[in-house]
Amino acid sequence: MSAIDDLPPLREVIREHQLSARKALGQNFLLDLNLTARIARAAGPLEDATVVEIGPGPGGLTRALLALGARHVIAVEHDERAIPALRTIADRYPGRLEIVYTDARTFDVRPYLGSTKAKIVANLPYNIATHLLIGWLSAEPWPPWYEMMVLMFQREVAERIVATENEEAYGRLGVLANWRCETKILFDISPSAFVPPPKVTSSVVRLVPRPAPEPCDRRALEQVAAAAFGQRRKMLRQSLKSLPADPARLAAAAGIDPTRRAETIPVSGFVAMARELTNSRNDNTT
């Protein structure tokens, strides 16, 4: 990564700009450029790619993305202290780094993209990571504006994202993520790699949108999954009673025994129940 050798070490950048991590912003800075390069390569190929990065901080991952050939990086940062450090990187890569000072939770990147498909690559602030992911998974229309996500989460959250039926971590997030994407944990990163070190191991997850997920209404799917996993130890015939449809009818439409529990139902089963929930609503309005 000789292309960034003339930039200061990240520890020096943090010291110069007084970038002590703010707990309120969920910040844990990854300083090892070998690890940031590994994350960037996981989103490859990057040549000619447009990348959206959330929470770049001092810019370690930003530098890796640019050094590995990303044509355009849109860096969304909510900490005003980091902006000067990012501008230094922008000066080294003229016309390739666009810095957006805003809150990622309310930011719509699509006007910045036009018709270009992007990749989302980020060491996400832990306190908003799940919120952001659910927003991206809820994108309409589908397929979405991004072609891939390579994201870092706490290991526990990563396990929930990739979990499938009969796994302890399986829940609402796993249903939504695996309905719309192919998911995989790529590798773990030790707490010691961060400043300050978090209390938990982190994991890098890749999510690739499925071009044609099994058809159903997303909101209905979320509603069924929320009801089922809200009382995950109860049978479906009990846990689904909060829905505006007969639980037995929903289960029957999916070919599922209503005495089963949510954790044993595959994503396809939730999709089938969501379709039946939509059908029952339509029946009630005709």
Swiss-Prot record:
EC number(s) per entry: 2.1.1.182
GO cellular component, one term: cytosol
Name of the protein in its database record: Ribosomal RNA small subunit methyltransferase A
Signal peptide: none
One Pfam family, short name: RrnaAD
Function: Specifically dimethylates two adjacent adenosines (A1518 and A1519) in the loop of a conserved hairpin near the 3'-end of 16S rRNA in the 30S particle. May play a critical role in biogenesis of 30S subunits.
GO molecular function: 16S rRNA (adenine(1518)-N(6)/adenine(1519)-N(6))-dimethyltransferase activity; RNA binding
Organism per entry: Bradyrhizobium sp. (strain ORS 278)
Annotated residues for binding of S-adenosyl-L-methionine: 28, 30, 55, 77, 103, 123
Subcellular location: Cytoplasm
SUPFAM superfamilies per record: S-adenosyl-L-methionine-dependent methyltransferases
Reaction(s) catalysed (UniProt annotation): adenosine(1518)/adenosine(1519) in 16S rRNA + 4 S-adenosyl-L-methionine = N(6)-dimethyladenosine(1518)/N(6)-dimethyladenosine(1519) in 16S rRNA + 4 S-adenosyl-L-homocysteine + 4 H(+)
Name of the gene this protein is made from: rsmA
Domain of life: Bacteria
Family assignment from sequence similarity: Belongs to the class I-like SAM-binding methyltransferase superfamily. rRNA adenine N(6)-methyltransferase family. RsmA subfamily.
Alphabetically ordered keywords of this record: Cytoplasm, Methyltransferase, RNA-binding, rRNA processing, S-adenosyl-L-methionine, Transferase
NCBIfam families: ksgA
